[in-house]
Amino acid sequence: MVDCVVKNWQGEEVGQATLNLRVAKEESAAHIVHRSLRLQMANNRQGTASTKTRSEVRGGGRKPWRQKGTGRARAGSIRSPLWRGGGVIFGPKPRDYSHKMNRKEKRLALSTAFQSRSEDLIVIEDLSEQFTKPKTKELVQAITRWGIDIQAKIVLVLPEKQENVYLSGRNIAKLKIILANNLNIYDILAADKIIATVTAIAKIQEVYGNET
């Protein structure tokens, strides 16, 4: 269980939020988080890289010159891998890089990773009333008031899609906005700081807290 300070729009402390997620045992936590991260990164690979072998490259059916008598090295095809424009030896072919992992394991890895980042977590009051229209400058100033360097990699977790908040944040280079029901382990681990609204924390707690 972790108690997090809740900050308002001005950056003042106004309360506390409790994060009590189901986490993996200490001896297996690193392994399960690593497996889940590897799964996500592997599943994101397109696997479409492709090269042609000497049998697939067009042309090269005729022997370039006779076997003996020219003084040149023997050659059987202009599409040999030794030649410019020839085939590729052991080059990549389209393949499926995806892995599988049990659903319960993935959820456990995600909740373990999120709770492990509690020291870098900033909980704030809901933003819906603060953005009647998109305003990047106001969001940048608020992030600074919350004690975060705007040059850091930041993940902002919202409970639901809020168009004005999204439009305000999309021009901030290292800010990524995700929804509480779209959490993923890569963004959680890659971020320098995580900002989450009180309602988003409640949603995460509802989904990942004390899961049986």
Swiss-Prot record:
Keyword Ribosomal protein found: yes
InterPro entries in alphabetical order: Ribosomal_uL4, Ribosomal_uL4-like, Ribosomal_uL4_dom_sf
Biased composition (Polar residues): 43-52
Coiled coil: none
Entry GO MF terms: rRNA binding; structural constituent of ribosome
Biological-process GO terms, alphabetical: translation
Basic residues: bias regions: 60-71
Ranges for region Disordered: 43-77
Pfam families hit by this protein: Ribosomal_L4
GO cellular component: ribonucleoprotein complex; ribosome
Entry keyword Ribosomal protein: yes
This protein's UniProt keywords: Ribonucleoprotein, Ribosomal protein, RNA-binding, rRNA-binding
Family: Belongs to the universal ribosomal protein uL4 family.
Self-association state and partner proteins as the record states: Part of the 50S ribosomal subunit.
Function: One of the primary rRNA binding proteins, this protein initially binds near the 5'-end of the 23S rRNA. It is important during the early stages of 50S assembly. It makes multiple contacts with different domains of the 23S rRNA in the assembled 50S subunit and ribosome. Forms part of the polypeptide exit tunnel.
Name of the protein described by the UniProt record: Large ribosomal subunit protein uL4
Organism: Trichodesmium erythraeum (strain IMS101)
